[in-house]
Amino acid sequence: MGLRKASAYSKKHVMPYTRISRKKGKAFIKVVPPQKIVKFSMGNEQVFREGKFPYHYTVLADENCQIRHNSLEACRQYINKQLETGFAGQYFFRVIPFPHHIQRENKMLTGAGSDRMQTGMQLSFGKSIGKAALVKKGAEIFFVA
């Protein structure tokens, strides 16, 4: 099954669900989805720390939003590929937000007789399906040097 549309998770003032405990009964989130972002820093970090890159570029958020970890990973792959083909190791690129917020889905059945099999909105906490980074307006998302 594919991803739900972004408007299902478009709340700007959302309560972050991150409670994970070693004791399963005390944890709000029973299963944590795996992290899709493989690397957060790419390129030549040593040259960046020495201060040899004269220009810096930062992508900022226009509004409060949730950014899914798979969309951050897709942007990371695209930007890193473009930088690698254009500058070949003479750059430094960093993904700044870390997806902590665990997104949930209360699956609903459709079709004949489905009302007898599901509970509706009783016990509607949902199962975890992905992670997201809660980003505030003006926060940095990507950094390129």
Segments (PLM) and residue ranges:
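Ribosome-associated RNA-binding proteins
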Residues: M1-A145
